[in-house]
Amino acid sequence: MFVWSKTISASQEEYFEDRFLGMAQTNAVITKLSDAKKLRVEVFLEKKNSAKNLINEFGGKVEKIKKRNWARINAPSKRPLIKIRDQILVSDNPNLESLKSLKKKHPNKKIIAIPAALAFGTGDHATTSTCLRIIVDISKKYLKEKTDWSFCDIGTGTGILAITAKLMGANRVEGFDFDPEAITIAKRNIDINSVDDIQIYEKDVFQWLPSERKSWNIIAANIFANVLNPNLEKIWSAVSNDGHLVISGILNEHHKSVIETSKSNGMPTPNIHTKGKWVSFHYQKSQ
């Protein structure tokens, strides 16, 4: 394991947040330093070449993380539990005893542990939290109707959306990401949460070809607009009749391009959720 790091000015925070955190599929951490005008960006990577690519692009430095330093990226922060509706609590502490304690304290909640520093997509970023709320709301309707449902997570990142879908009752769950680091982390988080029957694999959405014989009741696509728009037609084609498409990871200045692309593909008017500079869309296909 290697870590690339760089100290940046506060004025650069938005750029680096968009670069590393917006798609919820990189293992990045941005920390405010004691000097309020400076921040530290860290990206944890399995391969040294991946870290060197970041040096070529941004400068900074690379260190190899020794085994004794694993606590640095696995230790829980003091972040409070993240509540998603009345159904889910997201903790950043993967300790088994901690999870048992939380489950005992909150017997009517589903507990998900996503170590905060292992990858982005822990539930507290606007893109991820909005997706989680929408997925929970839709799944409650399926539960009430006692209907089987399926879920596909495009740009799975930490795997938190796929894990949530499975815990909320989805009978078929798949997730993919173009980043091999994200796949490693998603599989690790699935193990931490003892969730079975989630298929996670490496795939670039540009090369992804949905099967005519398989569709999903819910597809979540947490990806940038410049990746989403060229692929929106085939993503929409993979949504089952009466199914849902949840799009997130879209910056405010790009949301009009998504609306225009969706209209050109004959998609209905979406419900739009805005949180800060991020926009999410919820489309439902007719029967």
Model-predicted regions and their roles:
Residues 118, 122-207:
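Conserved SAM/SAH cofactor-binding pocket of Class I
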Residues 58, 86, 107-109, 171, ...:
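A short helix-to-beta-strand connector/capping loop
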Residues 70-145:
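SAM-dependent Rossmann-like transferase core, predominantly class I methyltransferases
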Residues 178-286:
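S-adenosylmethionine
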Residues 2-103:
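N-terminal auxiliary segments of SAM/dcSAM-dependent transferases
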Residues 25-26, 170, 195, 267:
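A structural motif
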Residues 110, 148-149, 243:
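Nucleotide donor/acceptor-binding cores
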Residues 61, 89, 150, 172, ...:
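Conserved beta-strand segments of alpha/beta enzyme cores
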